[in-house]
Amino acid sequence: MKFVAAYLLAVLAGNASPSADDLTAILESVGCEVDNEKMELLLSQLSGKDITELIAAGREKFASVPCGGGGVAVAAAAPAAGGAAPAAEAKKEEKVEEKEESDDDMGFSLFD
């Protein structure tokens, strides 16, 4: 991931085709170790490709992946219709619990 980040930083800085030396300089400037084998693999896979096209293709792939976020939105929308009643019930339950806790010590401490 750090190699991808360094590659993107170099592209954003205006270098359309960063070399291994460019990525090494970026990574060493922040104290990262450089694995030349992984870096060369990334550069070989990205050589001759436009980074904006790769990002667009990646977005399309992520858009087709189910993420399960729909269940959360439905659950969050359901209490909105009757939101006042559950909130009032929760406050009543909290008050009941506080009374029970205060009665447990019977007005004195065992360690006095």
From Swiss-Prot:
Coiled coil: none annotated. Keywords: Phosphoprotein, Ribonucleoprotein, Ribosomal protein. Residues 83-112 are annotated as: Disordered. InterPro entries: P1/P2_N_sf (IPR038716), Ribosomal_P1/P2 (IPR027534), Ribosomal_P2 (IPR044076). GO terms for cellular component: cytosolic large ribosomal subunit. Residues 89-98 have a biased composition (Basic and acidic residues). PANTHER family: 60S ACIDIC RIBOSOMAL PROTEIN FAMILY MEMBER (PTHR21141), LARGE RIBOSOMAL SUBUNIT PROTEIN P2A (PTHR21141:SF100). Plays an important role in the elongation step of protein synthesis. Belongs to the eukaryotic ribosomal protein P1/P2 family. This is Large ribosomal subunit protein P2A. The lineage of its organism: Eukaryota, Viridiplantae, Streptophyta, Embryophyta, Tracheophyta.
